[in-house]
């Protein structure tokens, strides 16, 4: 059983820790925090060994009466791999200043740039490329969702051009500092947005074939994508079948009352999901259409959780624990209780 250190027990880190803890071939050897907040206290309550991410701040945890095992320097060399959950730009610095120094493999998250790691990971597309590598970037929630859907489409036809409009949530539910509250913001105002090139970092054959634009709207629950994908030839039934066969994608029906991101979140709550996480992306079945070989569909992405199962598969790939990506996906899905 391999040992995983989660460096940064925040929005992504705490979910990764819980996901690792559910696997039978890996374990959490520790988690880190930069400050003694409620998440640090919760980590200890849940049984995780807590370490100070910044050694000079260890005393703050002691002063706050939060049990602390030491600093990251005391645990990192016991780790087979580190999952970095730090804010963007910090992950890159951690690779250069911490992980390479201690000769430990690491996964950084999608806030970093593709050039900051050896490759970009998605369980369906780049598992084999990342097999045995030392420093891998796990792409963002939006890119992860797009890669899954484009995988389904690519399995049945050739993609000539993909156009995507991303409607992004303004902030996570616990974020009181980010907006907007009463505006719609082109972000970026230029086209393409960074999402297209990010998809290409995972799927090189789509270079020159994907165009994305993005806006931010005042909601916290989920992102939404509208896809228009030109193909060499396809039917609606074939698209429906491909989506059904692709892991970590579910179809939802507006006709059954799931007609908004709010209803998708309510559905996730009713599934009994911790933190109402929906690791699967949700495609509205009624939105799927094919006109003149061009596929149209709309999908929703739970930005806090869709990348979590990918982190687990990435651990297996980098540590050469399972050669077959589909077997890893199925193993992860079973452990996490995913729908498919």
Swiss-Prot record:
Q: A Pfam family in this protein?
A: Gp_dh_C
User: What's its top-level EC category?
Assistant: oxidoreductase
Specify the superkingdom: Archaea
Q: Which SUPFAM superfamilies match?
A: Glyceraldehyde-3-phosphate dehydrogenase-like, C-terminal domain, NAD(P)-binding Rossmann-fold domains
- Which pathway does it serve? Carbohydrate degradation; glycolysis; pyruvate from D-glyceraldehyde 3-phosphate: step 1/5
List, alphabetically, the InterPro entries matched: GlycerAld/Erythrose_P_DH (IPR020831), GlycerAld_3-P_DH_AS (IPR020830), GlycerAld_3-P_DH_cat (IPR020829), GlycerAld_3-P_DH_NAD(P)-bd (IPR020828), Glyceraldehyde-3-P_DH_2_arc (IPR006436), NAD(P)-bd_dom_sf (IPR036291)
Q: What name does this protein carry? A: Glyceraldehyde-3-phosphate dehydrogenase
Q: Which gene encodes it?
A: gap
Q: Which reaction does it catalyse?
A: D-glyceraldehyde 3-phosphate + phosphate + NADP(+) = (2R)-3-phospho-glyceroyl phosphate + NADPH + H(+); D-glyceraldehyde 3-phosphate + phosphate + NAD(+) = (2R)-3-phospho-glyceroyl phosphate + NADH + H(+)
Q: What is its EC number?
A: 1.2.1.59
> Which NCBIfam families has this protein been placed in?
GAPDH-II_archae, PRK04207.1
């Amino acid at each position: 059983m391999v040992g995983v250190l989660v460096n940064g027990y925040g929005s992504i880190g705490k979910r990764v820790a819980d996901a690792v803890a559910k696997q039978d071939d890996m374990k959490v050897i520790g988690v880190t925090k930069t400050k003694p907040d409620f998440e640090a206290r919760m980590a200890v309550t849940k049984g995780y060994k807590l370490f100070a991410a910044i050694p000079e701040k260890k005393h703050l945890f002691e002063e706050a009466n939060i049990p602390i095992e030491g600093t990251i320097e005391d645990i990192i060399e016991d780790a087979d791999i580190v999952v970095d959950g730090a804010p963007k730009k910090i992950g890159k610095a951690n690779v250069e200043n911490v992980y390479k120094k201690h000769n430990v493999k690491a996964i950084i998250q999608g806030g970093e740039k593709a050039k900051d790691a050896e490759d970009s990971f998605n369980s369906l597309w780049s598992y084999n490329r990342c097999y045995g590598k030392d420093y891998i970037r796990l792409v963002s929630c939006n890119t992860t969702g797009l890669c899954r859907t484009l995988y389904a489409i690519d399995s049945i036809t050739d993609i000539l051009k993909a156009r995507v409009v991303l409607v992004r949530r303004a902030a996570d539910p616990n974020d009181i500092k980010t907006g907007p509250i009463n505006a719609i913001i082109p972000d970026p105002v230029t086209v393409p947005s960074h999402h297209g090139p990010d998809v290409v970092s995972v799927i090189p054959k789509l270079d020159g074939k994907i165009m994305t634009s993005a806006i931010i709207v005042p909601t916290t629950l989920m992102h939404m994508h509208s896809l228009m994908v030109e193909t060499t030839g396809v039917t609606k039934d074939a698209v429906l079948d491909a989506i059904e066969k692709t892991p970590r994608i579910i179809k939802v029906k507006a006709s059954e009352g799931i007609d908004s991101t709010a209803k998708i979140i309510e559905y996730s709550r009713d599934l009994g999901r911790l933190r109402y996480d929906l690791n699967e992306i949700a495609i509205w079945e009624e939105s799927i259409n094919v006109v003149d070989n061009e596929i149209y569909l709309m999908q929703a992405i739970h930005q806090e959780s869709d990348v979590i199962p990918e982190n687990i598969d990435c651990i297996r790939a980098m540590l050469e624990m399972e050669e077959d990506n589909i077997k890893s996906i199925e193993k992860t899905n079973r452990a996490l209780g995913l729908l498919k």
